[in-house]
Amino acid sequence: KNYFTGDLLWVPIKPPGYWQFTLDEVQIGPYQMKLKTGTAIADTGTSLIIGPTKEVSMLIQSLNMTDADKNEYDEFVKPCEDVEKLPPLSFKIQGRMFPLKASDYFLPTGDGDCLLGVTANEGMDIAGVSLWLLGDVFLSKYFSVWDVANKRLGLATAVPKPPEHEMHRWHESESSTGAKQGANLARPPLTATRRDSQR
């Protein structure tokens, strides 16, 4: 409980072999994207959020971004000072909204610009299915419990990582509880259960 706030939402995964579950809706600000067959995969091996080409294009348009906002690597960027003005991006899972602030889904590049942490899965679109890969951009915001035995994923808002000067207290607490704290580096294998808290 020291690692998250509120209650865990337990989401059944399907089919066995993937951390895949039903996604009800994606929302950017007040705009809702209704998904006929919404599916999400929690993927710690993916850095960004990857979505269907059509929906990601709609998201980019709602952020008033055009090709003029692309850098030399064909990535969408905005000045970091403008990011806070942008709307939240939310994923609705089993009736509960999991929002990301703009500062969560835009990533600083170190030169004053912030990179959009959502990209399209061009060439991977599946007809009739709205498939989203929720990588580190999403998982770094939410505490996750990977329950292999019961084929379910637990999600709750993660407690922010303490400042550097308080990290020793954090690690002492970790040792006493036996819970693992830190960034996910890989999906847990299907033969074991792993419990991870994010940043």
Region locations from a protein language model:
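Active-site or ligand-binding cleft "flap/edge" segments
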Residues: 1-199
